[in-house]
């Protein structure tokens, strides 16, 4: 496991009720969902939590048409605008993804791309990431994903509270790692 925690900021989270939106970038009910559930176990008592599951939504890829910059959201008649409304209303966003080809999943990237339609409404959020992959956590894949989120955080003035990376190759392997489960519950 790797990552940093802003302990002062996390202490402040304990004192404030927040609306947390979790974007589950995994289509499977495996190690990424296990990590999400551990986080929820620790955070749900004091916060309102909603999970967005992109694989269950009808969201078309961004066309890059730019119309959204002159109107109130994406022109696609799909689940984009209601999904982005939920993200924009959140105090904290948790991005969770398995590693696919040294990057985040297509499901998560699709939602992030569609956030372009209301990027300014996503400024100044508290953010965390959970990344689960099949290589040891000192592998370049986690660093690449963390750097991508760090760039987004800088651009949108996000307060990046934590980047957590976990190694799990077999289904349900993450659940057996008591240290990481306790760590996620403690965030």
What do the PLM-derived regions correspond to, one by one?
Residues 122-163:
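Short, glycine-/small-residue-rich phosphate/pyrophosphate-handling segment
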